């Protein structure tokens, strides 16, 4: 991918930011559960999660379809290229920029600082991919995580809305766990192994390796929280009486 792609890519990222801004405004008009309406602190989080859900559905299925359509890309993680994958990276870059701005402008930085760290890592990594045209397939593999995020976001929306159907939450709990292994942990483990074994640790390779290792630590931390919350609640510490208002990440 030559330099001629850079200006169109910037326009695509900007268009994605605008698209998610429009989705955010549309989410304001959607009906909200009584449990959300009665707690002002939850209104922003509910709307933010709806936009996040839209990104997860679109990006997760997009990544899955792109890799299914072109499986040969998996044999060239460093230099493989597809137009679909390039558009996907621009699309998700726009979402991460939009979500970061949404968090900051709505004064949620303190409660959602982990997302800001994650988004800064993702944006910087994706920009480097767009500029160099390398490791695009690695980004596509990482974006499979959005399939897992579909069910993780459903989990959080169910908790916030106090849905009176424990069976629905229980079913999603187990599906969420399976998806976490299949689309979050498995691609992450494979990419970490690949980078350690095959990628030269200098320049862009070193930068992406550092991002990947930090992401490994974050994913394991979130997995620990998920297990404690949904499967071993007796092991939770300091969560009694904790309010979820404004909290964007999985902490309860």
From Swiss-Prot:
* Localization annotation: Cell membrane
Which parts of the chain does the record assign to the membrane side Extracellular?
Answer: 30-47, 106-124, 146-174, 224-252
Q: Name one Pfam family in it.
A: TRAM_LAG1_CLN8
Membrane topology field: Multi-pass membrane protein
**Stretches assigned to the Cytoplasmic side:** 69-84, 196-202
Q: Which residues cross the membrane?
A: 48-68, 85-105, 175-195, 203-223
Q: Which SMART domains match?
A: TLC
Signal peptide span per the entry?
Answer: 1-29
The record's note on quaternary structure and interaction partners says:
Interacts with CACNA1C in vitro; however the relevance of the interaction in vivo is unclear.
Q: What does this protein do?
A: Regulates the composition and fluidity of the plasma membrane. Inhibits the incorporation of membrane-fluidizing phospholipids containing omega-3 long-chain polyunsaturated fatty acids (LCPUFA) and thereby promotes membrane rigidity. Does not appear to have any effect on LCPUFA synthesis.
What is this protein's name?
TLC domain-containing protein 1
Look up and give the organism this protein is from: Gallus gallus (Chicken)
